[in-house]
Each structure stands twice: as C-alpha cells, then as structure tokens.
Amino acid sequence: MPVLDLCQKLRPNQASVFTSQKRFRIVVTGRRWGKTWLALWWLVVNASSGPNRTCYFIAPSYRQAKRIAWRILKQQIPAAARRKTNEQELSIELHNSSIIQLHGADHPDSLRGVGLDFVVLDEYAFMDPETWPMVVRPMLSDRRGCAMFISSPSGLNHFYELYMVAKTRNDWATFHFRTEEGGYVTMDELASMRAESPVIQPCCISEQS
C-alpha cells in the first residue's frame, strides 16, 4: 500500500498551531500567511492517522473551496496515496477509508447529517454566523470531533466574538499572527504595498495562547 509522507517541514508559527493539543483552535492571520495550506495539512495528517475518519474543509462558498483549496489538497496527497478521487464532490478517500471533503458554507443543508472527526472552517469571519453553532458544532458531538477556524479579521463581528470567548475556555487555543510572520511575503513587498495603499496595515499583533 502506498504510504503518504507526513514529514512536512512546518514554519515555527505553523508548528505552534499544528502541535496544539486543544480540541478547538482559532487562527487569525493576515492574508498570504499560509493558513489554508496548514489547515488542509492538518486534515491530511489526521485522516491518515486512523481509519474511517471523516474530515471536512468548509470555505465560505463551494466556488472558493474548489478554486483554492482543492488544488492544494491534491498537491498534498499524491495520487498513489489515494484510493479514490471525486472531482465532482471534491473528495479524496485514502487507503485507510478516511475521507477528506471540501464544502461551501453557502449551501449549509448539504453539510447536515454527517458525523465529523475533524473540520476546518476557512475564513469564518466571512461566513453566516450560524454556520458554526447551528450546523457544524452538532456534527462533532457524537465523535467528539476537533475543529480549526482560520480567517483574516473582518472587524468586531462574530469571528472576533468567538475568538474572545475562546480565550477564556480551557479546550480552546487562540493564535494571532501578522502576514509577515508567515514567511511567504517579504518585508520589502509589504512596505511597497503599504506605500501604494496606505489603508493596508499590519493585520495584528502576534499573540498566542
């Protein structure tokens, strides 16, 4: 059976998120930090680590999931490590019968009725606030599944409120990183962008708990 190489080298900030032992994780970052890659890899590793696991990656829309995350996921999982790839349903089944599937929060009814082991909510700040408490959270209950929220900030909205509540909960971890801390965008490039568009500011002060 083909073996998936799980020995990816993570950047230090990515590793701090990845290795957290908390059941729920919230990651707030600037754009181009690498959060989508990290969240998908978290699903891949967990799907590979046990049989018959069901893992969802939920983007604000199906179109976003297909355009961005699907390409990354197929790069992370070589064809030889897959039992089945379904381009229509944006799903990959591994040889251990675990499944990773991409969805859009714009069709919430398509999410219901499935028990999840692991789930990522990508750009949760830009989803309907009810997506988590009314749709996704109950899907984790019977399997005691784990969740990761990744998003750039969008004012003092529901994502901000969840982040602040999470800081007071023992089973949650919160992470807060600037774009430049991801290591993908150089300081020179960021300085150039801010000079051209003064509205562009550092995402946030680095914080971790």
Regions found by a protein language model. Name each.
Residues 1-209:
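Phosphate/NTP-binding elements of NTP-utilizing enzymes
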